[in-house]
Amino acid sequence: MLKHKLTLSLPFVLLSIALSPSVNALELNNVIIKSGARIDKKAMDKKLNPYLGKEIDIALLQNILNEISDYYRKNGYLAAQAFYPEQQSQNGVVEVIVKTAKLDDIKISNYASLTPKTAYMLTENVRKFQGKEINSHELNASLLKIKDLNIFDIAGYFENSQNKADHASLTIDLKGRSRFGYELSYDNYGNESTGKNRYTLSLNSLNLSKHADKGYIILGTTDKKQNNLILGYSIPFTSHPTIFGFQFNYGSYELGDTYDSLEVKGNSLGGNLYIKEPLYRTLDSRVNFTGGGYYKALTDKIESYSLELKRNKFGGYFDFEASVFKEDLNFLNTLKLDYGLVQDKSNLSDDKSQRAYLLSNFDSKLDWNFYKNYSLINTLSVQYAQKAVDASDKFIPGGAYGVSAYDGSLASSDLGMFHDLKLQTKLMSKPYLDFFVNFMQAHAQNVEVEKKESFYAIGSGSNISYGGFYLSASVSKAIGKNKEYAKDSAKFLLKAGYAKI
């Protein structure tokens, strides 16, 4: 992420250690390294151990310098250079000085239309390195945390300082992205009772108020009057950068199909406040923490019986995300702990009962490009609870996000596990086209029931995208003991849309 063309001025060194006749036969006993840069001393000693006990000569001394310089550079010290000060060694101990560039001035090129105050706040952690030895790993960690806001692009590059020798000036470019974006999509991921065909419009704005903030609106509907509205907003308020955000959602439904005569309908209203903190970041890894609280008011009506069921749900949650990014491998993991309190406010009785439970969810995805255009993608989702959970928190083993050969309304449970193993090959790059085959399984169980139900399926599909347009199609077939509960002999799923980000 950081680029440089730094050079250091080094003093002329007299290699009197190796050239003096009195020490030609000396063996190397120890290497003393002096530097203001911080490294793992044990790891450095391990690198130099193979040279100990060998006869000191020009080749050995040069190899040691190369080894030390290379180690410092790999550990983030740009343009680090090891050299020997003038010295005489009579006991096989040599001294090495490692010179590294220090950070002088920092220039912010604000092409992202941020307010000066916001640009200054976000780069505060970078400015803390001024006057210190430049370590690209530490600087990259700070810059990547800013980049992870996904509001603008950021890049940095070093040049030799015009003010101080062996110092570097850092320029940070903040480049704005398209300020407004949208996405239109269609899919048949719904179910028969609430609408199989779903239509979604998403609108988003980046850097909405020029404070690196983000806002979005999501509107969704189905062919059977299920409607959803989601409003969200987030803004960084510290230099970490810690993010504060909120989300408001409203949904309504009317059950059709076999429920027409009962006139079943309902709605939900809710909100969520959260804080997101980046705990750790490198070029190939990331750890984030999110904590928040939420409120939901849910109402279900059966109008043919004049029956109304109401309940409120309050809760708090913690979410840990740990990700690893390599050239041929991405590994994403999320653990969420949710404490919920449900209050029953239905008009069936005067009883205002309430119940509380702790719910944990773990999601993992491994994407391994093991050979040329072939990838193995392993997806795992696990839900665990010690008590029966609210209907809104149930694990869904079927549907488009589970074992897709089964309808999403077939079953739900308190506990569950979903696993999808997919072999995928990329056929084209422009337009992008892939093909995959996969095996899916899900296991579901309720807290108060000992019996576990299992669902299995095999499938295949393809994804294509070009210039903002995308299309995903798949077909799956149920296998195993519960295959007779699959509504169709083969389930076809389709999603298509256009996104302008």
Regions found by a protein language model. Give the residues of each.
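Outer-membrane beta-barrel initiation region
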Residues: 70, 76-82, 104-245, 281
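Repeated loop/turn-to-beta-strand initiation elements of outer-membrane beta-barrel proteins
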Residues: 154, 180-182, 208-215, 239-245, ...
